[in-house]
Amino acid sequence: MSFVSIITPSHNSVQFISVTIQSVLDQSFSDWELIIVDDCSTDNSVEVIQSFVEQDSRIKLIRLSENSGAAVARNTAIEAAQGRYIAFLDSDDLWLPDKLEKQLAFMQANDYPFSYAAYDKIDENGQVFGHIGVPDRVCYSDLLKTCSIGCLTAIYDTQYFGKVSMPLIRKRQDLGLWLKLLKKTDYAYGLNQTLAQYRVRTDSISANKANAAKFTWRLYREVEGLNLIKASYYFSHYAVRGLLRTKAPGLARRLGVLK
């Protein structure tokens, strides 16, 4: 049984999946399993993944029978996971080599069941162009206002929570999971050290922003069950903070919206 189970959904990820897997293989902490769930890819990413599976028994590939979306893919991996800790890494993102070692030490030294970390933003060529710092801790209501937890950095302890799955929505399912966890504990704790790299794809930036807003509203209303007044209150925080981070990052930093 591995100590950490790494959850990676994959769909037509041939362009970046090799470097993503390699970033896991390069970890200084080695007691992990990487569970990749392929969501009916039509490129040759499955063949690429399989080549890694054949080289390292810690890497596992599960193939879905029909295209089902990232939430189903991640939940399938969570169900198959055997590790105490559940970590997340998407198929185009990267971990720095000491990510697991530092973050697990942070959690165990402080008895934290749920943690996250700072990360850099990279472009399609792997060049760093931005940085996302994190607050020391967040609670449920904090996260409704703005999601400070990057999926590629999140880790939770199944000894504390059990296995907790993502809500079955097409977008923002990661935020939905963090909210579920924060109903079971007071805080998630942030390690403000850069431990990962989030890849921003130029072909989907505008669409992602629009979809994120739409599905954030749906998450408030349909998953969290917030009434119209509460949902509007939290959505206004989400929208204003997002606008400040994008259009006025200097002001956002002074206000504590952008670390």
Residue ranges and their predicted role:
Residues 30, 38-47, 66, 90:
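A conserved acidic beta->alpha catalytic loop
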Residues 98-129:
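Conserved donor NDP-sugar-binding/catalytic core segment of glycosyltransferases
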